[in-house]
């Protein structure tokens, strides 16, 4: 088995089965450190437009993708793939010139890559939470309302490396620059995303990236499974052959490889962090992994660290832009009543739920700390104030339920079965059952959780048995579940007669627990998706009467929709934020979403590494480009050396 010198990122993060003994060789080519990074959950899709939906996804995607603009560590918008930009007030256009950087396969990033990627997101058939961030582009919104075509959208390549964007009238172009700094709007490769539409984002051979790292290898769902990211040697280096490894390492990206592993228990992670070579050989609880050299020590622990972890008291914390939340299906007969939703919120002790993780804070609003109000240094959360109680009020919850005319009922709480979600779900179940409700828990793996969160067209449903995820009529797919090729089956789908009238659409869940990720340090990206017309959901363009869809909660408030419309048309961030304060207040009165706690990035670092404090981006994720190991930079696994 391979050994890797270690910087070890856990709690998101887990220690691998790859730490048993073989020697180390000096890397005379000075490629840089091999860094072991231990995360507790894998990324299901490497499509940034679809997968920027929780703190773990942000960690992965921000390592491998870069947008036209980007945020620095303080949340300020700076140039990303853009080299220069110029705004012409008369023509209302922004012209971007791209810098000399390339995809991970060596092909230089072009203006056409942005035209394709942004039109792909804006296509009415495509679902993406970030879609409304592009609505400042001329005819982008009209396209999704059925009054324009893709050809009408204000995106054009002037030449290979120059992109022209025509904006809607009255738009502050600086707000658009802030929006396109989101990782969700990073470009993807048309020759892979269009040809291998259903599989490219899950195959390491088809994932071509624009950022500091690229996907070298993925071993998903297997014993000792791991993900290997390697320095993108073409990042800022289109003349790769003329620049030495040493310059690329020192100037752009210090580590050569990041190795993410997904196997061992929290206790074993603690053992590895505390391990020293003088302790001799130590076997971990899996009975196979041994620690027997200095390189086996965990040097870096980060992520959603459980409060019960033995190392918790030593952790440092940084805020993330994610809020653990509950989405309620307002089309459910019970949850359609605002009084029921209010009762469910009042019954929860947010302080107790937050205490499960180091650094997590009770959410008294949906918009997280770290989101600005006007200036970058200002706080939306501070201006908006506390909208929800941090502690439970069972008496008020029972009163709200009674006022809604409800004394009993059954609800299913669905969640992704990772980290400590089960513990959170169990606490929620116990709180709600004190109200006289019956709560069923439904833990799912990533694939089937995504299915539950997808819209269903009545008459064309996929019928899936929740216990075995199969039905009566089998069809083979390329889907891999739990690391093995699995037959996923579908019931016959009714052929809908297109009479020009859009069929009923719905979501097949009661309540889902998820990590709600803010896409930019702006409250608009948090709140806009709950408004009809800004949800980003695909629309059924095959029907004459197609119209924008609601958020997956089914929430549709004319008053809320109007507030988001006003915010969209605001001319600066402060004016927009003032309107969004009112929007958040209304949203959390109606409560289609119940915020629980704001996640934190809790981490520890040993003296063997440096640069870790410079590597945390505005999302609270580690960029790793500046992290180095002074004692281990020139070491690589012996098996790697022998293969060179």
Place the predicted regions along the sequence by residue:
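N-terminal lobe/hinge region of extracytoplasmic solute-binding protein
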Residues: 38-89, 119, 208
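Periplasmic-binding protein-like
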Residues: 331-374, 423-424, 586-595
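Gly/Pro-rich hinge or "lid" segments in bacterial periplasmic/extracellular proteins
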Residues: 170-171, 176-257, 267, 632-644
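Surface-exposed binding/hinge segments that line
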Residues: 130-192, 219-222
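Long beta-strand-rich cores associated with HINT superfamily self-processing modules
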Residues: 543, 603-644
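Extracytoplasmic/peripheral linker and loop segments enriched in polar/acidic and small residues
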Residues: 342, 388, 441-449, 468-508, ...
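Structural transition elements
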Residues: 346, 360-403, 417-422
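Extracellular/periplasmic solute-recognition and catalytic clefts
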Residues: 216-228, 257-331
């Amino acid at each position: 088995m391979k050994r890797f010198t270690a910087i070890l990122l856990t709690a998101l993060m887990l220690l691998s089965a790859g730490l048993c003994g073989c020697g180390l060789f000096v890397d005379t080519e000075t490629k840089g450190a091999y860094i072991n990074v231990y995360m507790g959950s894998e990324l299901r899709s490497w499509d940034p437009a679809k997968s920027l939906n929780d703190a773990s996804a942000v960690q992965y995607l921000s390592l491998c993708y870069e947008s036209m603009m980007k945020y620095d560590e303080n949340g300020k918008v700076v140039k990303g793939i853009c080299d220069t930009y110029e705004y012409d007030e008369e023509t209302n256009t922004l012209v971007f010139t791209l810098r000399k950087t390339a995809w991970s396969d060596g092909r230089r990033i072009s203006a056409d890559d942005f035209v394709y990627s942004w039109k792909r997101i804006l296509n009415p058939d495509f679902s993406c939470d970030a879609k409304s961030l592009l609505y400042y582009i001329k005819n982008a919104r009209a396209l999704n309302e059925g009054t324009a075509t893709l050809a009408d959208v204000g995106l054009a390549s002037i030449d290979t490396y120059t992109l022209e964007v025509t904006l809607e009238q009255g738009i502050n172009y600086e707000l658009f620059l802030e929006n396109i700094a989101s990782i969700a709007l990073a470009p993807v490769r048309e020759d892979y995303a269009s040809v291998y539409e259903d599989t490219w984002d899950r195959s390491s051979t088809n994932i071509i990236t624009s950022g500091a790292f690229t996907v070298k290898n993925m071993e998903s769902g297997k014993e000792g499974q791991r993900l290997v990211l390697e320095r993108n040697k073409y990042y800022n280096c289109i003349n790769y052959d003329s620049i030495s490894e040493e310059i690329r390492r020192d100037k752009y990206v210090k580590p050569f490889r990041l190795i993410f592993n997904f196997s061992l228990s929290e206790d074993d992670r603690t053992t590895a962090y505390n391990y020293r070579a003088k302790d001799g050989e130590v076997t971990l609880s899996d009975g196979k992994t041994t620690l027997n050299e200095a390189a086996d020590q965990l040097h870096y622990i980060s992520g959603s660290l459980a409060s019960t972890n033995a190392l918790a008291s030593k952790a440092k914390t940084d805020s993330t832009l994610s809020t653990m939340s509950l989405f309620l299906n307002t089309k459910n007969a019970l949850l359609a009543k605002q009084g029921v939703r209010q009762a469910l919120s009042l019954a929860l002790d947010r302080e107790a739920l937050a205490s499960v993780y180091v650094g997590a804070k009770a959410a008294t609003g949906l918009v997280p700390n770290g989101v600005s109000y006007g200036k970058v240094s200002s706080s939306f959360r501070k201006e908006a104030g506390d909208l929800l109680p941090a502690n439970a009020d069972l008496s008020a919850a029972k009163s709200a339920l009674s006022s809604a005319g409800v004394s009993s009922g059954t609800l299913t709480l669905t969640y992704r079965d990772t980290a400590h979600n089960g513990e959170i779900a169990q606490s929620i179940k116990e709180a709600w059952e004190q109200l006289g409700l019956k709560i069923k828990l439904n833990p799912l793996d990533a694939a089937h959780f995504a299915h539950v969160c997808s819209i269903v067209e009545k008459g064309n449903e996929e019928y899936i048995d929740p216990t075995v995820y199969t039905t009566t009529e089998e069809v083979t797919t390329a889907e891999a579940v739990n690391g093995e090729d699995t037959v996923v089956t579908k019931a016959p789908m009714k052929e809908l007669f297109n009479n020009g009238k859009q069929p009923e659409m719905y979501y097949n869940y009661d309540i889902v627990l998820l990590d709600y990720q803010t896409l930019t340090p702006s409250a608009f990206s948090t709140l806009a998706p709950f408004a009809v017309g800004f949800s980003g959901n695909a629309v059924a363009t095959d029907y004459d009467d197609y119209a924008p869809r609601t958020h997956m909660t089914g929430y549709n408030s004319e008053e809320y929709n109007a507030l988001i419309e006003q915010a969209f048309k605001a001319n600066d961030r402060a004016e927009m934020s003032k309107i969004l304060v009112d929007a958040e207040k209304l949203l959390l009165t109606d409560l289609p979403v119940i915020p629980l706690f704001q996640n934190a990035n809790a981490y520890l670092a040993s003296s063997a590494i440096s640069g870790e404090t410079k590597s945390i981006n505005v999302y609270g994720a580690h960029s790793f480009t500046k992290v180095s190991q002074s004692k281990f930079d020139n070491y690589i696994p012996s098996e790697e050396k022998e293969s060179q």
